[in-house]
Amino acid sequence: MARRARGTRVLRSVLVAFDPRRQRLRSLHAAFVLAAGVVGASCVPAGAPLVADKLHPCASTEGPTDGYCGGLEVYEDRAAASGRRIRLAIVVLPSVSSDVHADPLVFLAGGPGQAAAQMASQVQPLFRKIQRTRDVVLVDQRGTGKSSPLNCRGGGDSLRDLSEPDTDALEKLRTCLARLPGDPRFYTTNLAMDDLDDVRAFLGYDRINLYGGSYGTRAALVYVRRHGEHVRAIVLDGVAPMDMRLPMYAARDAQRALDRLYDDCWHDGACRAAYPRLAERTRALMARLDANPLRVTMPHPRTGVTEEIEVTSKLAASIVFRALYSPLTASILPSLIERAEHGDFQGLLALAFAGESATDAMSLGMQLSVLCSEDSPRYANEDLVRESLGTLFGTRLFTGQVAACGFWPKGRVDDAYYTPVVSPVPALVLSGELDPVTPPTWGLEVVKHLRNGRHIVMPGTGHGVAATACGNRLVTEFVDRGTAGGLDARCVRAVQRPGFFLTPAGPEPAPVALASAGAGDRR
């Protein structure tokens, strides 16, 4: 193996459906804390000399102070190769070893709309073991972070902003669109991955490893298709392929996760006794809110200021949807639903503010540029209705996105974009058994076309497998080996759903994973 020497807040009512992994970042945070002690901060960045002439040591406002920061200018309109230029923000976390592998790990953020370089301080602990022998590279994708961001923010911190009508949110979005400095047509995934290849060449890497989570898996697959000769291996964590047609299947996939919650509660005797007929009661609560939205007066979960908010079925459904991202937050849902039945919505509404900093960092304009160009042309309203039938969520969470795509500028995407990516590149495909947005079915579909791919389903896990101890070990070993063959995945057998909250004090000591049993390797 080659080696080298040392060297907005989002407008919630518009795009609440594919909200930026609010709950996933909560679970990631736990993994970050656990991983933070793996390598001491006193280690000397061995890979630094090879990037020092192109980047500069990061200031504390740019990224980790042991990293190198900088940028690369590219044309906004890559095909024309003229006109406006945009600067791509780059962070390199150099290897701490004196014997560094020449192929770095490149982190591709999710959303779409998250900024990878902006997340460097959060991401670094997750890949500490990989950073022992490899550089870790993060680039703010065009339209995000500090790379010509297409930021559209709306609302404030008040509770009433949670239930802002679509009409108000869409009007703010139109105003924002008119003021954006960039052309939203040029912020699609194809163009962004060509940017990434320019960054690869600029930094002097011949081959790279890719880690993509959620939308980042789509980006990784696109890079493999367009620049596969420069890819050593890829990790796809929570697969969102090009033909996913967001949010066409979102209600169906979320309902699957909610049904697993109901089943797991029923199979756990204590949960079944505490919350009998949970599915029936949840639907009854939504029906009540459909017929008569409630005006609730309560302290703001963060500020403590007493405010009034209208609780609609759409707001309640959106909170349930987001809570399902993480089994930890999902474990408290039965208790919060029971409280809401009796008119106490404080706990449920508090979940709406979980992971708020992640939401604020999301670029809504870039998100729309991707979804409206790549996904919305592939479905009609009747498709959304058909796929949402019989679900708790229906189409109510997605009406804002559909309306926004009616006026948002769209980039060019040809039909070939939606064909499966066929590649011999070694691939580790990870799916959370309880994932409400990128369930294992999507990973199973993608791995069929990856000749050297392996699909592992993590039981008791939601959106984001690498945040678990077992998942993190699998990612680290796979990147080190460069092949999924022979990878020991027995640790998945010990992963279980967290116990349900039976009292405000928390769950019973023993976790439950009864309906989630049987996960593991899936081809």
Please state what every model-predicted region is:
Residues 30-41:
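Bacterial N-terminal signal peptides
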Residues 324-338, 342, 377-382, 413:
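Short helix-capping/linker segments at secondary-structure and domain boundaries
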Residues 7-14, 18-32:
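Bacterial N-terminal signal peptides that target proteins for export
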Residues 299-318, 325-328, 357-365:
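Structural motif
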Residues 45-315, 369-523:
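Gly/Pro-rich cap/lid or specificity-loop segments adjacent to the active site
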Residues 332, 355-356, 400:
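Intrinsic disorder and flexible/low-complexity segments
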Residues 346-375, 379:
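Long, low-complexity segments enriched in small/aliphatic residues
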